[in-house]
Amino acid sequence: MFRSNARALNRALERLKNVQTKVNEALKRSGIQEKSLERKLRIWLRKVEENVPLGELILEKRSSCAIWLSDKDVEILEKVKRLEEQGQDLIKKISVNKSSREIVERVLGPSFHPQKTALEMLDKLKDCLKKKNVQKIGVWGMGGVGKTTLVRTLNNDLLKYAATQQFALVIWVTVSKDFDLKRVQMDIAKRLGKRFTREQMNQLGLTICERLIDLKNFLLILDDVWHPIDLDQLGIPLALERSKDSKVVLTSRRLEVCQQMMTNENIKVACLQEKEAWELFCHNVGEVANSDNVKPIAKDVSHECCGLPLAIITIGRTLRGKPQVEVWKHTLNLLKRSAPSIDTEEKIFGTLKLSYDFLQDNMKSCFLFCALFPEDYSIKVSELIMYWVAEGLLDGQHHYEDMMNEGVTLVERLKDSCLLEDGDSCDTVKMHDVVRDFAIWFMSSQGEGFHSLVMAGRGLIEFPQDKFVSSVQRVSLMANKLERLPNNVIEGVETLVLLLQGNSHVKEVPNGFLQAFPNLRILDLSGVRIRTLPDSFSNLHSLRSLVLRNCKKLRNLPSLESLVKLQFLDLHESAIRELPRGLEALSSLRYICVSNTYQLQSIPAGTILQLSSLEVLDMAGSAYSWGIKGEEREGQATLDEVTCLPHLQFLAIKLLDVLSFSYEFDSLTKRLTKFQFLFSPIRSVSPPGTGEGCLAISDVNVSNASIGWLLQHVTSLDLNYCEGLNGMFENLVTKSKSSFVAMKALSIHYFPSLSLASGCESQLDLFPNLEELSLDNVNLESIGELNGFLGMRLQKLKLLQVSGCRQLKRLFSDQILAGTLPNLQEIKVVSCLRLEELFNFSSVPVDFCAESLLPKLTVIKLKYLPQLRSLCNDRVVLESLEHLEVESCESLKNLPFVPGNTGMINEQMAWEYMSRTLG
């Protein structure tokens, strides 16, 4: 008995000491700032330090006399076991500092191909991060060699091990050629979770410095640095003792930049050796590179790429799937022809030109257009496509949807050729800076049809008149600091495209300025502070696209009557009070955006009716309310005009009352590919969502509303502060003969008296395909009540958001039978003051597989739930849970983890939980 107990105690002590070491390491790595939180973790460590010597003393004393352990000794053994279990829980289930989503953010873009040289450079970079005497690391090499790819891979590798890597925070900032101190500081501040007023802008560096000092150890990655940066001015406190474990990694094309920034280590990213270059080339070309006929030529083509990864990837993808020997020989000849007289940096332009030459003619111009935007700029794809159509690069005869589909296809082909890449947000693209440099070089060096002036994002204060020549076809001066536009520019300019958006200091467009551009097809003045446009604007007879987004002082425009070729008109968030005069004469106009025009009050009757080509009418968030027969305002357009537009595909409008929107408009709704309808008498209401069929009803009595016909087309329904919801739902339950299968999202805000008439319960699931459900201030004790109320089975539900439901005691209980939440992925619950638990499936049969109750639930976020005692009973196993955030839930006693979970809990929850469970 003694030997057995002694061995058990010895094993338990060894395990506990191992866990103690891991916790100490985690505490050291985490960089925890709040002393109270740090003290609570040390509670566990102190108990370990108290009990380990006691256990060792027992073993020492008992080894000399073979007697059984006393009851007191057995208590020590049990205490050691408990401490070991608690420690294991801390290591496995609690992210000691922050969730991985906070410590490291994923940087989008390709990782490098896993080759020996690349992996060695990555290992070398990681080794530098571990060296105590190394704070600043330079990564340098020519453009296109893979510097950004290397540090991006480092960043994303750190994300994989965010909870255990050495830094409290990893910050990624793209600097770019046109360095802007304030912009870089704002990017860092955003990563730190800081927002600033204009008055605080002058203190950005100081505020960043103070926050970084608190972090103790951080990693700052500065990508694409062209000129030395004063880190002290930026707000980076590397010189302080408290930040001695912090690091800065920068990438640059020039070693001189790294040296002037006093880097401790510099890593050169060189071109690939022949063998690895061939491997990367084959990876991108595919099997055709090793075919008998092609391989000898392919070897030579690979050699001509000079080991430069960007060239290898670009050329490789251009030739992918092309087995014709003639194509390969032609490619090789083109590469060799440019080789003798140009250096390596220009060599990449030769390889990129080869990829460019393989493009179809319209794709070439579309590709070059992308270079008009500033470096590292994320271009919205839909806006890019409209530019292309307006300039005549894409067929403008297609319907709007077909036009967008063609444009997206072209974008994807350019991405497949490595000439474009994904932008920083959804549905955006951008150019690699080397590819953009090539495009600008090509446009500035070519003759008729290509000549462009690109000075976007250069910080220009004065208009560069000396750069203008009559042959320039595209001009991009966007995102500068121009203070004024000249009254006179060189005469006879052939410019088709003039992009001036983002010059917020410009207050006026002189009359003579636009006279210099009689052939304009595209004019973009978004974000300038103009109140109107000059009379000469009316002479732009070739204009096809006029973009005046975010011109918040723009009150009116000259008559548009003479702009007979205009196709796209964008006045988003302008201050116009009525639609421009002469609009009714524009028979070619196919796109109007007046969204978020909060002062728009007038659309004269008959104006819209004349726009026979109109396909998109976007008035989301506009103050104008469309009337229907019987409620129209005198002299104002009504919805009946819209129904007469034969080509309309997208419609976003606001109407006063849903009751008058009857089945007679069903034919209109059916032929729309996308719509956003808002019904509200209130002038300023947020527009509905951005899905295919969005319906929002706000501050309306809907007790007599019969909208079943409309819900057949709706994908997203938002009900805000509506009276009579019980009556509307009763109508749906009693009159609906089929489910609303299109509905994917339902949001209800303020429904304090939810109740149906006796016996009025739906026998079918009204929303069988619902994926998102949001409830705010709804009178429910359990979400399960919706089962009987609307027949909602929630079998497709992925996201559930609940807030302010004061009667809610549990989310799901036996009213939702086991197995009906197979797709639920995320739950967010806020300010439900009576909520006691999330799940209670106590009546589920004992032999039922617990793991199948919520098989896909990965994220739970809980906030301000004072009565919440538990998340679930013992029957529920949250096998897939990955992320748990808990804030201000004082009564919560247990957490739903199982072996293998990697619980990512925010630090406030972690410490509150530890202080309760560890005593």
UniProtKB/Swiss-Prot annotation:
Annotated binding of ATP, by residue: G141, M142, G143, G144, V145, G146, K147, T148
Ranges for the LRR repeats: 447-468, 469-492, 494-516, 519-540, 542-564, 565-587, 588-610, 611-635
Coiled coil: 1-30, 74-95
UniProt KW Kinase keyword: no
Keyword Nucleotide-binding annotated: yes
Pfam families in the record: LRR_14, LRR_RPS2, NB-ARC, WH_DRP
One GO term of the biological process aspect: defense response
NB-ARC domain span: 121-399
Any GO molecular function: ADP binding
Keywords of this entry: ATP-binding, Coiled coil, Leucine-rich repeat, Nucleotide-binding, Plant defense, Repeat
SUPFAM superfamilies: L domain-like (SSF52058), P-loop containing nucleoside triphosphate hydrolases (SSF52540)
Functional summary from the UniProt entry: Probable disease resistance protein.
Family membership noted in the UniProt record: Belongs to the disease resistance NB-LRR family.
PANTHER family linked to this entry: NB-ARC DOMAIN-CONTAINING PROTEIN, NB-ARC DOMAIN-CONTAINING PROTEIN-RELATED
UniProt name for this protein: Probable disease resistance protein At4g27220
